[in-house]
Amino acid sequence: EPRKFDPTFRGPVYNRGCTDVLCCVLFVIVILGYIALGTVAWIHGDPRKVIYPTDSTGQFCGQKGTPNAKKAILFYFNILKCASPAVLINLQCPTTQMCVSKCPDRFATYTDMQLLYRFNKSHWDYYKQFCKPGFNNPQKSVAQVLRDEDCPSMIVPSRPFLQRCFPDFITRNGTLTVANKTAFKDALDTARSVTELRDAANGITSIHEAKEVGMKIVEDYASCWYWIVIGLFIALVISLIFILLLRFTAGFLLWFIIFAVILLVAYGIWHCYWEFAVLRETPGADVTISDIGFQTDLHVYLQLSQTWLVFMVTLGLTEASIVLMLIFLRKRVRIAIALLREGSRAISYIMSALFYPIITFVLLAICISYWAMTALFLASSGDAVYKVASGNPNCKYANQTCSPESFNRTNITKQCPGAQCLFAFYGGESLYHRYIFILQLCNLLVFLWLVNFTIALGQCTVAGAFASYYWARRKPADIPPCPVFSSFSRALRYHTGSLAFGSLILAVVQLIRVILEYLDHKLKGAHNAFARFLLCCLKCCFWCLERFIRFMNRNAYIMIAIYGKNFCTSAREAFYLLMRNVVRVAVLDKVTDFLLFLGKLLIAGSVGVIAFFLFTRKIPIIQEEVPVLNYYCVPLLTVILGSYLIAHSFFSVYAMCVDTLFLCFCEDLERNDGTTAKPFFMSPGLKRILGKAEQSPKKSRG
């Protein structure tokens, strides 16, 4: 039921006790366990297993202080035995793998080498660097060499990629070649096609192209990083100026934002139409995006009329949505602007709240770093596991574990000629190694819990600070000193358990969503329509559930900051308070978020326009200072995204301020009636907008 009038109530309760102590204890135990997990992973893990490729004997390629120190590249004796690039990268190709200092640069076979060796021994000197260390018998028969895999049967021109030698595929006039050849012969004088190499390493060409794009992007970042920093600094300054201007010109500025965004999107529509109209008359520009497929040169897409048509339609739908919202929700927009004006006034009294996101950022950076390092060490835990590799499909010992030291003394080599004991992967049969996957899930769950707790702590801190502003009768005289620090200490001292409780609920739902995404990825190639439909429904339901829990947690933290009760009680009271004001909540909350989103969009868009003219060298004054870029859109998108995130960090405080003031406003309406005996705490401007004028003393007495 609605709260009763309490003449002694003055905002956040100071006399409070610890809440959800059991969850607090559990949270502390989990953190200690998480530290223990990281320690165990650090002891058993070895990042070198991820950083360096490993040869058939389990030795790292390129590791300092070892015989392979100057051999940083992995070479495959017979790449034709490899089924796919995934097999290569997972180091499970059934052929000998050896560390080399460089990849082959020519076609050659062991048979040709033996013939040429009689006349020139330099052929063997070159070929033997791709043979097993210590092998120096070029007279050994081809059959025996291939059986024992002392040397590769052939070598092909290759280049290093992912620290592994892959065939150097080059497309010439639409034909796939290696060293300008489309065919070659192996050691058994069998004709081979370059297509077979491509099939053995399917997808390597596209990956290589992606690598080239990545290298060009890195070059762009290296040459213009300081311009990116300047752009982000401009976004920071604009965001601060924007927040300060809201204090004095909230109404004007917000209406300016609305119409500025409308004009900005309208300009985008006009520019897209102009580009579309020009390209429509250009020969060859009518090709569709699907026809050209993936291109490493991103400028190709900007030469297509369809690209600009897609941009134009997208911006047109955005423009229509904004205009329709303004037409049908203009009254709610006025109320939202009044709330934002009140929020700007509150922030002007508590400016320190704007810098609290720095603390959140530092804590999140620590959480992310610890999770990433723990995941890396867990993934690299385990001992070297060796398995029998045989080219004979009838070998019954194939894929069984083996020991390199005793392999030659077993019967496997007799029953399966040519079989070898090769390194397969890192793992183990101990209890720790068997539950690596479970430990990774635990690592992810605790990471999500800590991230959500960090965000919850920030929300509760900011809510407590702004609640003390709203419930102060005389502003700023009745606002307590250091409201942000006081609210932070209260939240951490008394309500760690409650914040951990709400964060855990959200973390569990997020973990379920991650698992569903993983299952969806695994079932992409499945033909079970019912399973796909069920999975799609579950993903949709849990997405909605996560959004609802986020909304309820946010309001529960506000109630915790004000009344100091446990999580369940605070969530229930917040829910009922919102339900009693459901008409206001349903529209006002989203309208306020929409206005703040427009502000973030305007800041990111404005900085983005400046960055566009800068990176395309269209500003004459500094044209010579700006480097020529391969893909100007990459640093441009970086500046736009970074500007949006910077604006979001400031506006997140603003949004929490408005949500807190709105909840306090709803309580104010229930506690007080505007009479002299029960005056409202809301500002005159907010009362005027809502039509809640003070009642006369005569009416209150009557």
Swiss-Prot record:
Predominant location: membrane
An example Gene Ontology molecular-function term: choline transmembrane transporter activity
Organism of derivation: Danio rerio
Positions bearing carbohydrate: 120, 173, 180
GO process terms (BP): choline transport; transmembrane transport
Extracellular topology ranges: 42-225, 271-308, 356-357, 465-498, 615-632
The protein's name: Choline transporter-like protein 5-A
Entry superkingdom: Eukaryota
Keyword entries, A-Z: Antiport, Cell membrane, Glycoprotein, Membrane, Transmembrane, Transmembrane helix, Transport
Family to which this protein belongs: Belongs to the CTL (choline transporter-like) family.
Entry membrane topology: Multi-pass membrane protein
Transmembrane feature ranges: 21-41, 226-246, 250-270, 309-329, 335-355, 358-378, 444-464, 499-519, 594-614, 633-653
Cross-referenced PANTHER family: CHOLINE TRANSPORTER-LIKE (SLC FAMILY 44), CHOLINE TRANSPORTER-LIKE PROTEIN 5
Summary of the function given for this chain in its UniProt record: Choline/H+ antiporter.
InterPro entries assigned to the protein according to its UniProt record, in alphabetical order: Choline_transptr-like
Topology, Cytoplasmic side: 247-249, 330-334, 379-443, 520-593, 654-699
Subcellular location per the Swiss-Prot or TrEMBL entry: Cell membrane
An example Gene Ontology CC term for this record: membrane
Catalytic activity as recorded in UniProt: choline(out) + n H(+)(in) = choline(in) + n H(+)(out)
